[in-house]
Amino acid sequence: MKNISTLYIMKRLLVSIAIVFISILTVAGQNHSFSLSGKWNFRIDREDTGVKEQWFKKSLDNSINLPGSMPEKLKGDEVTVRTQWTGSLYDSSYYFNPYMEKYRIEGQVKLPFFLTPDKHYVGVAWYQKKVTIPADWKGERITLFLERPHIETTVWVNQQELGMQNSLCVPHVYDLTAATTPGKTYLITIRIDNRIKEINVGPDSHSITDQTQGNWNGIVGRIELQATPKIHLEDIQVYPDLSNQKALVRMNIQSASSTKGEITLSAESFNTDIQHKVAPVHQSFNIRPGDNPVEMELPMGKEFLTWDEFSPALYKLTAKLTNGKQTDTQQVQFGMRDFKIEGKWFYVNGRKTMLRGTVENCDFPLTGYAPMDVASWERVFRICRNYGLNHMRFHSFCPPEAAFIAADLVGFYLQPEGPSWPNHGPKLGNGQPIDKYLMDETIALTKEYGNYASYCMLACGNEPSGRWVAWVSKFVDYWKATDPRRVYTGASVGNSWQWQPHNEYHVKAGARGLSWAGAQPESESDYRARIDTVKQPYVSHETGQWCVFPNFNEIRKYTGVNKAKNFEIFRDILNDNHMGSQSHDFMMASGKLQALCYKHEIEKTLRTPDYAGFQLLALNDYSGQGTALVGVLDVFFEEKGYINAEQFRRFCSPTVPLARIPKFVYANNETFHADIEVSHFGAAPLKSAKTVYTIKDKFGKVYAHGTVGTHHIPIGNLYSLGSVDMTLEAIDTPQKLNLEVRIEGSDAVNDWDFWVYPSQVELVQGTVYTTDTLDAKALAVLQDGGNVLITAAGKIQYGKEVKQYFTPVFWNTSWFKMRPPHTTGIFLNEYHPLFREFPTEYHSNLQWWELLNKAQVMQFTDFPATFQPTVQSIDTWFISRKIGMLFEAKVLNGKLMMTSMDITSQPEKRIVARQMHKAILDYMNSDAFRPAEKIAPELIQALFTKVAGDVKSYTKDSPDELKPKIN
């Protein structure tokens, strides 16, 4: 057995190979095929009368080009406020809020909760084309191949109905043999119905929902007539057996008559710098009419190549059935890969593996459906790999074959799911049609895609309701007994869902998130207490969900089916609140906080013993469910500007140095201490690896450096490398320092900021009058031209409804009905003279936790349009109130500074607040204190008295996470 490196010298060539193989895998073995792409007759059947009126006998009076969807071809209805969407809405204020009236006008509709399609249609549509069957197909089996229709198809050839299919996961294939004669012309009519009917997968399932791809009507991918010999091979399944250096091949010979035949199996690698050819094997068979199951062994030899994330070597298996003068040759792609579980870990080919994943939600705005070509998927997987990931979960949908081909080429571990979120309507395990449908769909997708090495895991879907635990237990039991090529879990679920006792592994929330709402940031803790009692591998469900402010420059990218009119609404709201020019600043500042949260949550996962992996929600944005801007990449998998792949890989990659640090804020009479560990899930152990560290300031001045240690680093996490200590007495001014840890001879490097403040601070009041309200003395001081500092922590009324944590909005405030927090960090001008004594960037960083977390904000809606606070909180983009925690102004004849941060309590313990207090006083006593904006005293007073009122969502229903734990 050899594990070799893949040759990536020419990406275009590799993509070309992949594109060729998409044809080889599904078409090879057929004597003939021809595409039906192009112009089709077309007609919308709004009243569903076409069957009764026998439209299959008539020529349809419109036309459409296929492949494609109705929205893609601008067919369907204009979007109005009466459009019936496929998806849940938990904030219906759009329909009632007077501000939104301009977005509800006919012909000008813009939606805030997901992207707005150009056209929308749910119902029946008919597609029709005249086709001549080639004369040389005589004696062949003839099929109609529809790669991905949506959703239910019924096919007629002339007036003969051939049946109905409704898979959301695999191609619809109809046998036309008995209904056609080669050399003759036929009218093929396809009726497609995209309504949710008896089989309800759930309105929020990513296979159908308007939250992401949209519930479209049409056919995408390949549309073909295909011909194969009537005696042919089908359902070829390859079962790698690495320990015995062979592959077991199971297949079926389909025959119309009794005969004899011989099967020859051979294989060769095709995407590696070392080519490996497998000696062919032969076996003769007596063939009966109908199905003839066949099992053969293919010895791979000692030099076979393995497939994994580091060396994704692939084979092309050729199966040749010879029967007299007829030959049927088929090819399938497979990899010699073993994906197993031992204890609480996954093992790939015997190597312990941690999954670093993201959730894919079928969010492709340009087309409104998942890409059908290999190149597009290869791009996605390579971007994910560049960000340190090796795994992708497909949330309540199964991607097309192109995704599996691309993941095989890149070396990416996939978890497709049944096409269902059986909730918000349907219930799993209650005897509804969804029970049988989900089982049938997972069987079908495994039959279709089961040979792909990247298909490593399977779940039935997302977060079910009903009597679902018993159902998924039977589901897992069936698959464990049926197909050993991958591992199985019942459903991917949130924390309030029950445990699934038969799971081989768990995808569950609960062991995720940051505890910063109640405790200061540190990097010592982990999630072990939450997963200690779990015996199977635990993969975190939908980790992250940290929000960033919208990037309005992104709007121009939406040139296809779905438009970012939600972004246009959010931009209007920001403009109407006189902050339009700050949109990019808000995006960048909130993005820095988002990236910080992802860093610390991922590192917390990596330093947890026996934590098998995580699935981010998500590396890229999610367009629906209110608009969930949770990605460090936009929905197109493109950078936003505040973090790049190299920076992300510092804390998310196969090998990550980790530091357990008790806190990130120090007085200069303390000692900084960090215990250094490593999470290493690379291709091999690291031998004699030397780990070094450096501590420096923002200018690059080095305060300490040295060697942590030299070690043989095995595969796994929690491997201790040593520690770093530094006394801080030499730091006599407030400083941000940075600890960087690097493993020499590798790409593994990581870093952490920490802050040092003087242990002794003198607060000089000078000429400043300090109060906690705008009292009579404050007004008198201002009238006389003096300086006033108002420390109003806990006393603010106007802005009281805005709940601010240090961490940003989770998912979004629309979907979660204004559940706190409501802000996405702060923005400030770091060059403002106030911050000369308070080191900061323009965005939130860990030193701000003491001042920001659960601090009140002040609302400045009534202030002049040009007013900008010194420390500005970034509100949820659905409201974009002008809010902040610190501002300066000219009031009467004097100068005022006011803060809602607590800068005065417990100064001996709260050294950040104490330093901010000093910085404010020193600034106010300096010549630099020259506020530009003049504010009336009445507006200052209103901050203590005015009540804004709560935001209304109007909808009574709510997401499952806000309901009692009934799942």
State the predicted function of each range.
Residues 155-157, 246-285, 294, 671-710, ...:
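Beta-strand-rich binding/interaction modules
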Residues 766-812, 890-893, 920:
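Short alpha-beta junction capping motif
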Residues 381-384, 391-633:
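Substrate-binding/catalytic cleft of secreted carbohydrate-active enzymes
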Residues 43-47, 76, 87, 92-107, ...:
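Accessory beta-strand-rich segments of carbohydrate-active enzymes
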Residues 29-108, 187, 191, 195-197, ...:
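Accessory carbohydrate-binding/adhesion or oligomerization-edge regions at the termini
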Residues 181-184, 252-340, 730-762:
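Extended acidic/polar, glycine-enriched regions
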Residues 318-384:
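N-terminal carbohydrate-binding accessory modules
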